[in-house]
Amino acid sequence: MKNIPYQQNAINELTDKTIRLLNLGGKRHKIVFEAPTGAGKTVMTCQALANITDELKERGDSRYQEVAYIWFAPRKLHLQSYASLKNAFGETRKLRPVMFDEIDQSEGIQPGEILFVNWESVNKESNVMVRENESFASLYEIARRTQEEYDLPIVAIIDGGCKLNCVSKE
């Protein structure tokens, strides 16, 4: 990544705020990270996730030392983001981008894994990823296992392409 001051400032702020919210505990804290098209949001987010992973291990005052991630994106954008991050972390292996069929569903998301999910597979009527069946655990079950069995917090990244279409069904 090029050393562009506004990007570095955004990465540092995103890293610090995320760790502060993780240390608060509880659920569903929100950070909104917006930047114009072409500003490098994916690159900055990628670097922030790497920084979060490093700093949680290094800080003595962190509530957690490890974290798991779920990255939601609409249409085929999750595949593009997956490929970008797989390329970015290919050499360092600091974080491990994975697709739903690549994780051990009986165990959940492992520390440092980024699970890439198509938003429509969760939010549309067919919502295949949130229904239990004989072949696959639901995303809810995988998240539960991740949190309960590994005591890992999950940071959800809602890709900016979802801005108008990704509305929570709470």
Where are these regions (language model features)?
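RecA-like P-loop NTPase motor core of helicase/translocase proteins
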Residues: M1-E170
